[in-house]
Amino acid sequence: MCGKLYVVATPIGNLADFSYRAIETLKTVDLIAAEDTRHVKMLLQHYAINNQLISLHQHNEEQAAPGLVEKLKSGMNIALVSDAGTPLLSDPGMPLVKLAKQQGVDVSPIPGACALIAALSVSGLPVTRFTFEGFLPRTSSARKSFFSERKNESATWVFYESSHRILASLEDLLEIMGSDRRIVVARELTKLFETVVNDTLDNVLEQVRNDRNMQKGEFVVMVEGAVIEKNVTEITEEQSRVLQTLLKECSIKTAVAMAVEITGARKKVLYRAALDMKGNN
């Protein structure tokens, strides 16, 4: 009988966020595959979990995945955990999950803490559509290129950043996006010094630059999507009828102003249409 692979979320800071189901799962599996066994061992000891640990990180996961899948197919139950949060989201585990699915192994999520979702939930930015970009490139030139490619993205986009690069990354972001783009910087979520700042890019950068504490910890940065203006050049029949009626009694300026109030059409488009109407009379 084939075993099951459990993808288990762990706390991102506050241990009280560790679910009862996650704890019970880790107590009952045969093996726990962890990103950093030393880090995860401290968490497990807190809950008196003494199951066998095996290291699964970005440098060995391609080689380790086949062996773990064979263990699953032999009947072992295995839990996959990262150092903090939900595995696979900027953390190791994809090769194992992908191969397990390909080999017909049942993969089950044990949901819980996730820095990405926690940050979005308190951001105040639109979250109907969002793009998660993981960690940014390390060099300034690569980051600027990365930002330039996403400058006109209409959805909210999110990235993780470390304490030693947060200031430089925000400076690069300002250079490409401009000062008025709204961003949210969420720092140390669920921890003692949790901070969430929502403001224009220039104001957020100034706050981070002037406060050394704002340069410490783990960061989730969310960037408001670009506002794409529709290139409307024509008016509807109803808007045209209203404008023509007003032009019979009013000047172009007054007629356009009133038509904007009545129809909600753009002033520039109505003004151009009014000039055409007057020119044809």
Which stretches of residues belong to each language-model region?
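A contiguous loop/helix-start segment that scaffolds small-molecule binding in enzyme catalytic cores
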Residues: C2, T156, S163-N281
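Glycine-rich, flexible N-terminal cofactor/catalytic loop recognition
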Residues: M1-Q58
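General beta-strand structural signal in soluble alpha/beta enzymes
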Residues: A34, V107-G112, F159, V185
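Conserved helicase motor
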Residues: L56-E62, L136-T139
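Short active-site oxyanion
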Residues: L26-I32, G104-S108, T156-W157
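Ordered, amphipathic secondary-structure segments that act as subunit-interaction surfaces
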Residues: S74-A84, L89-P92, E161
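Class I SAM-dependent methyltransferase SAM-binding "motif I" and its flanking Rossmann-like core
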Residues: P95-E153
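Loop/turn-to-beta-strand initiation segments
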Residues: G3-L5, G75-A79, A155-T156
